[in-house]
Amino acid sequence: MSSYANHQALAGLTLGKSTDYRDTYDASLLQGVPRSLNRDPLGLKADNLPFHGTDIWTLYELSWLNAKGLPQVAVGHVELDYTSANLIESKSFKLYLNSFNQTRFNNWDEVRQTLERDLSTCAQGKVSVALYRLDELEGQPIGHFNGTCIDDQDITIDNYEFTTDYLENATSGEKVVEETLVSHLLKSNCLITHQPDWGSIQIQYRGRQIDREKLLRYLVSFRHHNEFHEQCVERIFNDLLRFCQPEKLSVYARYTRRGGLDINPWRSNSDFVPSTTRLVRQ
């Protein structure tokens, strides 16, 4: 269990509680979670973060009524800046989007502006929103993470409790390498409900070579760990930076969708540009 799982800031969340679904617009449904909850225990300070990045959300179940009452549908792309005070809690995001269902808007841009305004207010930070018509995305190929997959290792694992022990002495030699490693075995659990979160992760770095077996064992140790997606990515970035001390580091995870939403956080201290094409499990 995370050290802050019972923090009072989480007590008012609708997550894990029975809730009514509203289909008329209500911005008050959105709920934020302070990023400081997991950053403080990691020693990460808002004015001196070792990374930049965004939380990329894909909205697959977005619908509203036009001015004449005809339903509209879109796929939304949301980017929430890492400097925001709060992350957006996903169940509240789903409930908020449902409140658009029977609400009339004059045009698509009014919907986009409404989303951008409300999400920025909840997050207390910069948010950008783009809406796509379905025909704009039809035929879009399934993407993949570039890099070397480390999953096919003939190793025995019998411990699934989170630990950084595997990263102790995980680098070797003095030669500096630059490589991208990928795993599809990332699995953590919701901080509140403990429902499983499934993801693929891409780790791009420059520095002393990281032992792939130790890295895989470390990633598998998240299997019983309870944290939100964004928090896991920041924890992984911080742990790799601390124990492996790469010159450059980027960590990008793309999680499977739940409730019509997928969350894809990335953190980097270099000029990393994430691919936004959905992966095969998304």
From Swiss-Prot:
SUPFAM superfamilies in the record: Tetrahydrobiopterin biosynthesis enzymes-like
The keyword Cytoplasm appears for this protein: yes
Source taxon at top rank: Bacteria
CC annotations in GO: cytoplasm
Pfam families: QueF, QueF_N
InterPro entries linked to this entry: GTP-CH-I_C/QueF (IPR043133), NADPH_dep_7-cyano-7-deazaG_red (IPR050084), QueF (IPR029500), QueF_N (IPR029139), QueF_type2 (IPR016428)
Pathway named in the protein's UniProt entry: tRNA modification; tRNA-queuosine biosynthesis
Binding site for NADPH: 90-91, 258-259
Annotated EC: 1.7.1.13
Function of the protein: Catalyzes the NADPH-dependent reduction of 7-cyano-7-deazaguanine (preQ0) to 7-aminomethyl-7-deazaguanine (preQ1).
Name the UniProt record assigns to this protein: NADPH-dependent 7-cyano-7-deazaguanine reductase
